[in-house]
Amino acid sequence: MGSTSGPRLLLLLLTSLPLALGDPIYTIITPNVLRLESEEMVVLEAHEGQGDIRVSVTVHDFPAKRQVLSSETTTLNNANNYLSTVNIKIPASKEFKSEKGHKFVTVQALFGNVQVEKVVLVSLQSGYLFIQTDKTIYTPGSTVLYRIFTVDHKLLPVGQTIVVTIETPEGIDIKRDSLSSHNQFGILALSWNIPELVNMGQWKIRAHYEDAPQQVFSAEFEVKEYVLPSFEVQVEPSEKFYYIDDPNGLTVNIIARFLYGESVDGTAFVIFGVQDGDQRISLSQSLTRVPIIDGTGEATLSQGVLLNGVHYSSVNDLVGKSIYVSVTVILNSGSDMVEAERTGIPIVTSPYQIHFTKTPKFFKPAMPFDLMVYVTNPDGSPARHIPVVTEDFKVRSLTQEDGVAKLSINTPDNRNSLPITVRTEKDGIPAARQASKTMHVLPYNTQGNSKNYLHLSLPRVELKPGENLNVNFHLRTDPGYQDKIRYFTYLIMNKGKLLKVGRQPRESGQVVVVLPLTITTDFIPSFRLVAYYTLIAANGQREVVADSVWVDVKDSCVGTLVVKGGGKQDKQHRPGQQMTLEIQGERGARVGLVAVDKGVFVLNKKNKLTQRRIWDVVEKADIGCTPGSGKDFAGVFTDAGLAFKSSKGLQTPQRADLECPKPAARKRRSVQLMEKRMDKLGQYSKDVRRCCEHGMRDNPMKFSCQRRAQFIQHGDACVKAFLDCCEYIAKLRQQHSRNKPLGLARSDLDEEIIPEEDIISRSQFPESWLWTIEEFKEPDKNGISTKTMNVFLKDSITTWEILAVSLSDKKGICVADPYEVVVKQDFFIDLRLPYSVVRNEQVEIRAILYNYREAEDLKVRVELLYNPAFCSLATAKKRHQQTLTVPAKSSVPVPYIIVPLKTGLQEVEVKAAVYNHFISDGVKKTLKVVPEGMRVNKTVVTRTLDPEHKGQQGVQREEIPPADLSDQVPDTESETKILLQGTPVAQMVEDAIDGDRLKHLIQTPSGCGEQNMIGMTPTVIAVHYLDSTEQWEKFGLEKRQEALELIKKGYTQQLAFRQKNSAFAAFQDRLSSTLLTAYVVKVFAMAANLIAIDSQVLCGAVKWLILEKQKPDGVFEENGPVIHQEMIGGFKNTEEKDVSLTAFVLIALQEAKDICEPQVNSLLRSINKARDFLADYYLELKRPYTVAIAGYALALSDKLDEPFLNKLLSTAKERNRWEEPGQKLHNVEATSYALLALLVVKDFDSVPPIVRWLNEQRYYGGGYGSTQATFMVFQALAQYQKDVPDHKDLNLDVSIHLPSRSAPVRHRILWESASLLRSEETKENEGFTLIAEGKGQGTLSVVTMYHGKAKGKTTCKKFDLKVSIHPAPEPVKKPQEAKSSMVLDICTRYLGNQDATMSILDISMMTGFSPDTEDLKLLSTGVDRYISKYELNKALSNKNTLIIYLDKISHTLEDCISFKVHQYFNVGLIQPGSVKVYSYYNLDESCTRFYHPEKEDGMLNKLCHKEMCRCAEENCFMHHDEEEVTLDDRLERACEPGVDYVYKTRLLKKELSDDFDDYIMVIEQIIKSGSDEVQVGQERRFISHIKCREALKLKEGGHYLVWGVSSDLWGEKPNISYIIGKDTWVELWPDGDVCQDEENQKQCQDLANFSENMVVFGCPN
């Protein structure tokens, strides 16, 4: 810790007498943070020692010193130069695991008979946990594979129990496991299946050692619906900063490469912006389209665009901000798009920054000072080979590869603060733009101004293991004392532990001594060298002089781990091919492997486990805090992470926090048309320039300038400027014809072998594989083991990154550099599928054919294979083949239009073969097909589980109904989740009383027997409270010993007032006092836990109270009243005094019972008599004070049962205090007794308001008349701190009885896992019973998820809403990747008496459409703002949702907004979009309207090829209109297996909606009865998809013959519906006059015969 923490004073408890020469000094040095269950080195040293000195080291618990946690012995003698070490190990006990406060131990060293003792902070960290996931991003329903490496502080494998939790993006734990890494060699391989229905976002795996819950390690992974990209994009600025004066602007290079290494051809859309903290300003004028040719492109942000796009008063206001650039690259084939962003390009005045982070803050006067100057580029990367100079000392140097330059300065011989200014001297940069920085270094403080110094210096080199380092020890001291310094003691710290100690001898006259050090792998990643000497200074006092230096070592693995390819490395790998991997590592190590598709890291490259990340975690746990040195000798040790104590009282300040002190944060100061537009802007001053600029913006609604100006709320000057510029630009626009935007280039298919059956399609496309753990066996002569593995590559054409992490019991953990395996072939298919498509929605997919042959065009036959789960141009009877030419070094997209018919994962397969070559490829991928409609999450119930209070005889029974699924999409599943969570006992929000406020209670007791107790009480209770609440670090750890000495003094003094009968009085000659004696018993019983108390004294007093002062009825009497009435608290009031005195004495007897029961035979009998007396009178007591004190006495005697407890609680005022008017101290005392009583009987529910009231009194004890109140409030609060946070009274047994399961599902909810969300899923929508028993509370939530039908028109009570959509007028400005554009018009008016404030438009886009964000920005950012802001959310189903916020909606005029919407992918049957308007303040006042392009616009039909429409309709019902159907045909088909029913029906009415049509049929004849027990004349609902409306052509009033299969019956009896599907027969049944027509006579006769045959004879089978 630095000088900013701990007491400001160095605790130099120096003796006042000069030391004699040869007077030995003993020192103890330990790390100032000791870790549990970890071996820690303690350094023991004697200076001027003689003979053998036996040293015993003991570690005790702090503060009580009740336990010996570790003990070791050693001997100091001439042989070891009076320097020795012992290793101690602190076991993990439950005291250390409690989460209250920091933990400390007392390390005690006994040198012969000289004791040296130091209190040291304890860390619960048992080691490190590193978590590796197989990928960084996952889709819903996939599996996360992860490994946890369990290592100790040396990074060696350790077998321990760990707790692992999976945490949602909202921070809720949904899975928790306790696992052991024993016998696992430190590697736990685990997995977790992500549910299909899951929250998107950043999930976490959190893990901690079971005995160190505070030290949590975590790894994040993202859950998202995505498709892996086929290429990656990198954005590289030409400079890592933007120089504010640079007239050339900022250029960025765009590099786009396919994952298999080939260059991309496409188009990049680039936009720049400025970032200021969290705020982003997009520079819309910078939007440019850049061609990507052969994988590269270039975009430039000009200085003018930057300055015009931001509204700062001066250019310098931009300094300190940063530039970001967003790039979207689209392939020329249009099949794939990848986004990339580069952020944090700083805007600077100087291209460099100077840091002093690696420089000590203290110097030794007249000695060299090593200034380590760290120079960085503005992005934080090291600036290499930059000249630097110190202005005052003219010392020059050059930065090395790591950006650091060393400048050695000769410091002056004075004690003043030393300012040092460093600047860069880079050629070509003007002086004003060179970087410069000043630091002030302070002189090292010597003891007694002795001017004795030590300075460590070392050469500036990058150290690697195996190299040697010479450290120079420079000495400066009084010449007369130099010869007394015969050696330096040095210590080396690494990873928070003492690694090595030694002595470096010094010969007489040596001013510089060299210590040679060999760097080993133990020194990685850095180490601290601390050195000191000791002498007796001129003033006769013992002095310690110290210095330290922090040394960086090159980060690398401690051991070896290399992954490489075996065999020929130049060979190109092909998909599915076998390859050889060669892995080299340490013998006996285990290595975890994984191969990851590089496309994963294009989407998310965060959270990869690397060796750098491992060292970062280790460095973060370093307990040293500065780059070296210190303000004095103690500061040197403390800042290096060491605790020092000597037998002469010299010591380091107490470290009280595991974290290093944070430095105080510095406060920071905080085209022709375009040209004419800029000229116009220049006519206006800055304050109204924005109004002019917004007047020249385009308006999507085409409002007039006058109408637009009505929306401005910025004053007349703004309106005037707006109107002028608006009208100016309108005239200009009429004169300019706008250029049409360029479209994406498309390759035309040319008109113009291997058989398809012989082509084996590639079908294995995992995102990761090779998830194995291998063991290294026999090593070679160099000690390195090699493992050779033959693996078969997967089918992806990509680059695989093979990652390896090894764990060795000798060399620890090591992460290898990734090994890349490129997989490709000259000709292949890339089949691009979306993440999911909707059943029955027509969609376009693309197969891209790539030809990487050098100079040969390929003639290719490509085929989409038939799959009955889709409608496409491939059918069971006819192949869909195309022939086309793919030019050399190029690609051709082949679009396919399909209609998915079945939900689930369906296969899409495309094959291609090249004419006249033996070349082919095939790809088979799965496409996720989801049901129509919107996913609905319906909360069925939320209930509180509290069996004790809500149940009968402790059993709570909850009947849960099924969800109402009346709007469910037919032929889809629902899933019900039953969620359970415990509710832990509410812990007090308020902190207990701050220990730092109790200093006034530590006081010296004195005076008579009463005064002495008045003085001793506060000290005893303060120590008890600070021990219980673990707050000594706030108070001062060294003060505890002082307090114990005062208690000992008070105890000794009190014995003077002990009379011969063992009782106590104010003076020896006064009558013995019952109250004082009982009070002595109470205080001494508590003090017995702190100091040695003679049990004869304590128990003699107990015996006197029982034998002399207790009457036969149990009451205690007082004959020697106390003189000092201020010590008796609430006893002053004489009302009910027998009860209150008896209760007081009984409490004292109970608290002394553990000590005195063996010595006082009558103790229990006396306690019972007093208890019975109190019980007889308790219910009649009136005084709140007496009720409280007697209640505590009864509780201690197990007698505070229900009627007495009710009496206690009912006496409280507002259930939080026991109050008598005008008696604040008595009320605090009484309430404290009551709190103790409730804690004893564990009535924790009643406790919180009482503790809150006591805390609110902010009563810190002390003052006249406060003895009892002080003692009781701190006794009560200490007991509360002890009991309630550890109170774990939650034990619920919950059983769920589902009708569809044979046995109930059982869960036990305990306090330890209360926050864990337990989940049960069922696919059945059924009611069920839940039974809860036990203690505590929990929450039950039941949520059903299903696909709901799109709702029809809703009634609109408070809003009028009109929505329309029409094609955008040409010419239209649209994104290049957009296929078409339309304009959405929304007009609304509020139907109330005044305007609706804060309203919201919730707009669901049509499938395949997205809004034009530029239009939305215009609507939201102009001074004539029409909307206040908008949010665009990508929903689960390829449908965008747009939220628009409006400040108000008028109640007199229609408010209208218009914006373009662009179609990005083609869908045959476009689902309608919807617009909902509602007021933020009244969510029920909503109105919804749907919108849809009409068929005449061609959007419904333009993709529908004739055969495909036919295919889609064939799945509507069983077709029979192609050929004449005979009677036998009908009989044969109606009697096929699976046919459930045959009816003659009449269509009563049609209910048409936006996705499904309902036909209400009356059953006129049951020709064959099925599983539905329907009667003639009843109505039944027949459901059909809207795509079948035209094919069915059902007419109201018409009669129909209908039959179908049992699987098409839907719902539960009696509400069964019938789905009309491909197995449903629907035939018009002519009747009446129609049958007279000749053409219908045969059909009518056949239908009548069919009906008769079926009814009379039935089916033959």
Curated annotation (Swiss-Prot):
GO CC annotation, single: extracellular space
Cross-link for Isoglutamyl cysteine thioester (Cys-Gln), residue positions: 1008-1011
The name this protein goes by in its record: Complement C3
Modification Phosphoserine occurs at: 38, 70, 302, 670, 966, 1319, 1571
Residues the UniProt record annotates as site (Cleavage): 745-747, 1301-1302, 1318-1319
Spans traversing the lipid bilayer: none
Function of the molecule: Precursor of non-enzymatic components of the classical, alternative, lectin and GZMK complement pathways, which consist in a cascade of proteins that leads to phagocytosis and breakdown of pathogens and signaling that strengthens the adaptive immune system.
Chain spans, region Disordered: 947-969
Segments for region (Interaction with CFP/properdin): 1632-1657
One biological process term in Gene Ontology: positive regulation of protein phosphorylation
Superkingdom of the organism of origin: Eukaryota
Gene Ontology molecular function, alphabetical: C5L2 anaphylatoxin chemotactic receptor binding; endopeptidase inhibitor activity
Organism: Sus scrofa
